[in-house]
Amino acid sequence: ATMQVSNGEGSQWRIDMSVRGRKGFASILGLNLEQSTVFRVDGDTYVPLSQSTVRKAMFFGKKVTGVYNWQTASAQWDGDLKKERQQAIPLQRGDQSALSLNLSLMRDAQPGRSLSYRYVDVGRVRKYDYKVADATEVVQVGDLSYDALRVYRVNSGDNETILWIANGVPTPVRILQRDKGEDQVDLRLVEYQGA
């Protein structure tokens, strides 16, 4: 997987994430996921402007794009998704896309804090609540070792999301997603390059 943040025109930024299935069933299916969010920074808030998701596999492909229109205070997606998820969604200040949410967690994670965000992405609205561990822990990722804060979603039911965030590292050093106790996605930072 790769994650990249780049400066666009003026005050606009873009965050891209690309995941390639290289092990197990994901490798057999040739599963690939590409996500992108264009956003601007308004004070201490990441403001998403547009979002796209492309999923590819051996037997299917899906593409979804969305626009966050802050002048009309609504967001809307089109592409390969259900009709009810193509309806306009009223926006609220501070709403986050999946990728801008990761940036917000990186910025906001402090020992012992509780964090809350409204996730608006791919035609869905959800409240995401997180708890940050009281202290850092050593996280081994390949040959690298990080002193990182564990940040975990507390209102996700059987679907767990845990991130490990290290001071001075521009992305989470690890993102683990579990469904009913089974690891589904385990992304680990094995290398990063500065600007």
Q: Residues of each region from the PLM?
A:
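Acidic, serine/threonine-rich low-complexity disordered tracts
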Residues: 1-70, 108-195
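Short, polar/charged, low-complexity connector loops/linkers at domain or secondary-structure junctions
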Residues: 99-111
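Short, mixed-charge, low-aromatic patches
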Residues: 85-90, 106-109, 119
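Hydrophobic, well-structured mid-protein blocks that either form specific transmembrane helices
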Residues: 57-102
